[in-house]
Amino acid sequence: VTEILIALMSGPQDGALLTFETFLDSGKPAEITFGRREDCDVCLSYDSQVSREHAVLTYDGETFWLEDLHSTNGTYVGEEKITGRTAIAPGQLFRVGRTWLRIEPLPTMLGSDDDLPF
């Protein structure tokens, strides 16, 4: 089991930390959907700039991939609008509608204590 943490960085849920458990041993990459629909994993119904099914974040065990699902207002990594599937690193900001989000690095992604400078 791997946990993926998504931090909401703006809007009425600013500061919320969402946890998703993934079972990568099933052979299927983990997927987290973003949109206004209640059945999306991250429901952003308060943001009128978010499409019903706006974007999907996929984790294949090594890389996070963000993909816009033909939304009206686009999906951005930083200030750059993405087209197609785009690799995104933990800690990097991305925007769905007007809502900024971030993938939080997991302790296993930070490396061992030997990598620390102190």
Locate the predicted segments by residue.
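Gly/Ser/Thr-rich beta-alpha loop segments that engage phosphate groups in nucleotides
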Residues: 37, 76, 99
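Short coil-to-beta-strand transition motifs
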Residues: 48-52
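Intrinsically disordered, low-complexity acidic Ser/Thr-rich regulatory segments
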Residues: 1-47, 58, 95, 108-118
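Forkhead-associated
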Residues: 42, 53-93
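Short, charged beta-turn/beta-strand-edge "cap" motif at the junction between a beta-strand
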Residues: 100-102, 107-108
